[in-house]
Regions:
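Cys-nucleophile CN-hydrolase/nitrilase-fold catalytic domain and related Cys-dependent amidase chemistry
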Residues: 21, 33-125, 194-196, 200-210
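N-terminal phosphate-binding loop and adjacent alpha-helix
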Residues: 13-30
Length: 318
């Protein structure tokens, strides 16, 4: 469905109730109510908002046995079945508010416990529209999350337009982006944990490359958000995720809202989806400016199995 109208969107930068999925979902419902009151039809919430992102500031400790079993158990207990009752709560909020939402969760499989997934959900008044599992957990995330399969790389048709996107550093994967671009996203959701300047530059590039409005939303995680009985020792710092929510338009990659740092908050912007059509008149990465006929044949055959990170070179003792 190609929608050519103005859609009001909300980038909701928020702090989860860490290791409490039920309380985090209740908070998400309140935040969606705030977004609806502001007139938003679509809201985007952060990566693994329900209900813990394994930050590289402390996640390395999970490679030891000190506290790691307890953390893993509590993460699993505070993760989300998809579909499941917590998803149903969010869908009920979408239905009552007449909204769509993209939200990041830690997904579990209750019937087959043992692996969690970094998952992105598309929800709306009609229910669970789609889910995508992160293809490649980043560095420290591999202590917690399994890898995705890739058959869920899609843009979803809604009455807010076609909504595509990827999770955090998946957005750095050119072929993953291209796979979604081919489905014509008009709005690109990028839940993330990256609060760097380089990330925002990348979001601007994706807006230009895709011809879509980009909504990127990290968490804001102050030290005070962690429960007193958090199983791992936290390093001495006050903030573990500084935010940086941003909305970017598709013609020249201009930032139209944000970036928002150092606090919880919400960015609201009216996205004129006709701008994506105008942008693609000049550059359509998967249409008139694509040369699949030339470039696809230059790609080597993909390996049958995912590549592992090579081990470090062994140093012989002197």
């Amino acid at each position: 469905m190609t929608v050519l109208r103005t859609v009001r969107v909300a980038a909701i930068q928020a702090t989860p109730v860490i290791l409490d999925a039920e309380a985090t979902v209740r908070k998400a419902v309140r935040l969606l109510g705030d977004a609806a009151q502001a007139g938003a039809e679509l809201a985007v919430l952060p990566e693994t908002f329900v209900s813990l992102y394994p930050s590289n500031a402390w996640a390395h400790q999970a490679a030891t046995f000190s506290g790691s079993d307890e953390l893993w158990e509590r993460m699993w207990l505070s993760s989300v079945d998809v579909p499941g009752p917590l998803v149903d709560e969010l869908v009920a909020a979408c239905r009552s508010l007449g909204m769509h939402v993209v939200v990041g969760v830690n997904e579990r499989e209750s019937e087959r416990p043992g692996t969690l997934y970094n998952t992105m959900l598309w929800l709306g008044p009609d229910g669970l529209l789609h889910k995508h599992r992160k293809l490649m957990p980043t560095q420290h995330e591999r202590l917690f999350h399994g890898i995705g399969r890739g058959d869920d790389l899609r843009a979803v048709s809604t009455d807010c337009g076609r909504i595509g996107g990827l999770i955090c550093w998946e957005n750095r994967m050119p072929l993953a982006r291209y796979a979604v671009y081919r489905q014509g996203p008009q709005i690109w959701a990028a839940p993330t944990a990256d609060d760097s300047d380089g990330w925002i530059a990348h979001m601007r590039a994706i807006a230009i490359e895709s011809g879509a409005f980009v909504i990127s939303v990290p968490q804001y995680i102050p030290r005070t958000a962690f429960p007193a009985d958090f199983p791992l020792a936290l390093p001495e710092r006050d903030v573990f995720g500084n935010g940086g929510a941003v909305i970017v338009e598709p013609t020249w990659g201009q930032i139209v809202a944000g970036p928002l740092y150092g606090e919880e908050g919400m960015l609201v912007y009216d996205c004129d989806l006709r701008l994506g059509l105008h942008a693609k008149r000049l550059f359509d990465a998967v249409g008139h400016y694509s040369r699949d006929d030339v470039l696809a044949g230059l790609l080597p055959a993909a390996p049958a199995e995912p590549r592992d990170t090579p081990p470090p070179a062994r140093t012989e003792p002197a």
